[in-house]
Design a protein with these regions (language model features):
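A generic structural motif
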Residues: 84-87, 137-143, 201
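N-terminal signal peptide c-region/cleavage motif recognized by signal peptidases
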Residues: 16-19
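Boundary of Sec targeting at the N-terminus
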Residues: 22-25
Length: 528
């Protein structure tokens, strides 16, 4: 076995031909979010990894439909129950002219747990016990038992230069070393020039890139969080392409002959998450007094919330059609998604009865938190949820805040009810269920993103069993069963699968939208 595709075939492969007024040598991109640091190991958030892919390569590459493909590793295979062998690409150069080899892979794997931030990247190497260098282009990775999905995890294993980053591999030194450019030496298609946090990331083409030269000598990634401002910049010619066109602007943009737009399915599912602790901080009676217990620990309350959500309205009205109703935490066809899970019924009368049966006939009040600047429609979905829940008696105060505030607070377990998007970037369930639905257990390195203290011993058992199954058919069935149990518990309530729109100057570019929503300059070709 060399590499394996865990995805069912994906139908869409839309190609966008878009052209414009910018220089054929410079591409200016308007993006909703940017990196939190130039250190690729700091954050697992999508915008951070998207920016990192311009400078650094991953050991295994994730294709357009999230199929795994050779990257800096050309092939991989299990050699025994707890060892994988990876063959490394020869002739690859870092931006400083030094050779890429096995030392850099070993260094990067061992560095990640040391320097990761609160949105941890350690999940990508959680199964690694040790790394042996066999020769400059062969490594053996020893795991803590059978690890069938290790190559999938490595689509986010960014490789840094062991020499350039040697002095910048502690929490205290990492960001400064990379942000200054001293350690920002990758093998990717572009070289680091400068970065202004929350502003411009300026890149220069690396002519020695192993995939070949890109079309653009210079790339400027402008971080423009506001959707209207980003679109205005495109219309004014200040940028050549933008991501995350809002649902409000999409229909009008489609009629604009000066701008080309394309829509693609997204890997991201919006999930409502309900705190399962005995005492939760942001729930109270309608008169402001404390409740005797956390209502979200009662399954009837969680079911009531699920039945209060009108997913069709959320897609058709709130998102202007840019989405699909979701019934589980991964898109259909992904490895471990289950066809047995029904789409939840919108039934507000049933919601009210369930609340009354649980002892909350008068309802209660809760603060709902979400991001307002990360994924398309996040704030609008959050507002829609607030209205729907309030209508059945759960008075909901919506707080759509910056992702830079939201995620650290989520990691501190500050919230009682919160919503954010989760993308199954590896295309298979161990990533999503292992991160979110397993109890938070550092000993087995699962549940790192379980911020609600959800725990189901059957789910834990299934996920631990599935993680060690090399037989794909048996593993799929195990993950499907785990998904069914998680969605039945309703501590996680999936709402919609997003769809994403890009806009660009008419006739300037050719590119195919990616399922993970990444906007990557190297794969945007000049149409001229």
């Amino acid at each position: 076995m060399t590499y394996q595709n865990f995805l069912a075939p994906m139908a869409f492969a839309l190609s966008l031909t878009v052209a414009g007024a910018a220089s054929t040598q410079t591409l200016t991109m308007g993006v909703r979010g940017g990196p939190e640091s130039i250190d690729p190991h700091f954050s697992a958030l999508g915008p951070h990894a998207e920016a990192a892919k311009h400078i650094f390569d991953t050991l295994v590459w994730s294709g357009i439909d999230l199929q795994i493909e050779p990257g800096l590793a050309t092939s991989w295979k299990p050699v025994d129950d707890d060892t994988w062998e990876f063959k490394l690409r020869k002739g690859v150069k870092f931006h400083d002219g030094s050779d890429f080899n096995a030392e850099d892979v070993k260094f990067s794997i061992e560095r990640i747990p040391v320097v990761t931030g609160p949105t941890t990247t350690a999940i990508y190497v959680r199964r690694v016990a040790s790394v042996d260098i066999i020769d400059p282009h062969t490594i053996h990775i020893h795991t803590d038992g059978q690890a069938a999905t290790l190559p999938n995890d490595f689509i986010r294993l960014f490789i840094v230069s062991s020499e350039a980053a040697a002095d910048f591999s502690t929490l205290e030194t990492a960001s400064a070393g990379f942000n200054s450019g001293a350690a920002a030496i990758g093998t990717g298609p572009y070289k680091y020039v400068s970065w202004e946090p929350k502003g411009d990331l300026v890149l220069e083409r690396f002519d020695g890139y192993w995939r070949g030269m890109g079309d653009w000598e210079k790339v400027i990634r402008k971080e423009i969080p506001n959707d209207s401002s980003r679109l205005a910049a495109l219309k004014a010619g200040q940028v050549d392409v933008i991501n995350y066109v809002s649902s409000v602007d999409y229909l009008a943009l489609a009629k604009d002959t000066n701008i080309d737009s394309v829509k693609g399915d997204s890997v991201y599912i919006m999930n409502l998450q309900l705190d399962q602790r005995e005492n939760t901080p942001l729930v109270r009676a309608l008169d402001g007094s404390d409740l005797d217990e956390n209502p979200f620990r009662d399954l009837r309350v969680r079911q009531a919330i699920d039945h209060a959500i009108d997913r069709e309205t959320m897609v058709d009205i709130v998102l202007e059609g840019l989405g699909k109703p979701a019934n589980q935490m991964m898109p259909p066809g992904f490895f471990g998604s289950s066809e047995k899970i029904p789409m939840p019924e919108y039934n507000p009368a049933k919601s009210k009865k369930l609340l009354a049966d649980a002892g909350y006939s008068e309802g209660f009040e809760v603060d709902l938190y979400c991001t307002g600047d990360r994924l398309p429609g996040d704030a609008a979905i959050c507002q829609g949820l607030g209205q729907m829940l309030t209508q059945v008696g759960i008075r909901t105060n919506v707080n759509a805040i910056s992702k830079t505030v939201y995620f650290p607070a989520q990691a501190r377990l500050d919230y009682s009810m919160f919503m954010n998007g989760w993308g199954t970037l590896t295309g298979e369930a161990s990533y999503t269920l292992g991160g979110l639905a397993h109890s938070n257990n550092p000993e087995v390195k699962l549940g790192a993103y379980n911020r609600i203290e959800y725990e189901n011993s059957d789910v834990d058992r299934l996920l631990q069993t599935g993680a060690r199954m090399m037989d794909a058919t048996a593993r799929r069935a195990t993950y499907e069963e785990a998904m069914e149990k998680v969605m039945e518990d309703k501590a996680y309530i999936s709402i919609v699968q997003l769809q994403t729109v890009w806009g660009a100057k008419a006739g300037m570019l050719q590119f195919t939208p990616r399922f993970d929503e990444d906007t990557l300059a190297f794969f945007m070709k000049s149409a001229r």
